[in-house]
Amino acid sequence: MPFDHNDHYHRLLLRQLPPGCRTALDVGCGTGRFARRLAARGIVVDAVDPAAEAVAAARELTARELSTRELTAAAGAGERPRFRQADVTQVELPRGHYDFVSCLASLHHMPFDTVRALRESLAPGGVLVVLGCYPERSRTDWAWSLAAVPVNAAARVAVALAERVRGGRPAGPGAVRAPVAPPRMSYAETRREAAVLLPGCRMRRLLFWRYLLVHRAPDGAGAPGGAGGN
């Protein structure tokens, strides 16, 4: 499998989990890799994607991996990600239910104000985390893109060499790729909209043409602030 920009940030996203997280929603789950990492922590995970092929692959991969170390905790708790083919803009999400909601390179496939429904689905103190994409529109955008190019090339070579040492992997359900679409909203536009729709959110750029947006639902511990970041 080639170097994957979204998988690269899984650890960063997992660090955003709120204490005592019990329930999660993964929006645009693809083949379910991040959903499985959540389930491995004993979290009850609902994972949705509009692409039937991706959901089928996610279910098959999960069934294959239930006996591996990655899913030991989930298997012991009798839980696995609950994959569902659905367009999150067309379904009614339970209000105040999820401790954690994740969107990995999926938000730009839907209207940005979909975050309203995702925000409302958060339990008190719950966290919405978006690993988003943006087009290059400003000098700062281009500077980050240029900085990513050599790192991206080195990472791709490292992954290719590692797979060659392991003898490569046969094509399977993990090779399924969800439909892609170019992002429309610039980083600046996203930041402005987020400040309005997600009071108190924090947003920052990442390498590999990504940004991280984190919003915590009020829990009575403090007042929200504005959208920070660079």
Regions found by a protein language model. Name each.
Residues 102:
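A conserved beta-strand element that flanks and buttresses the S-adenosyl-L-methionine
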Residues 129-158:
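Conserved class I S-adenosyl-L-methionine
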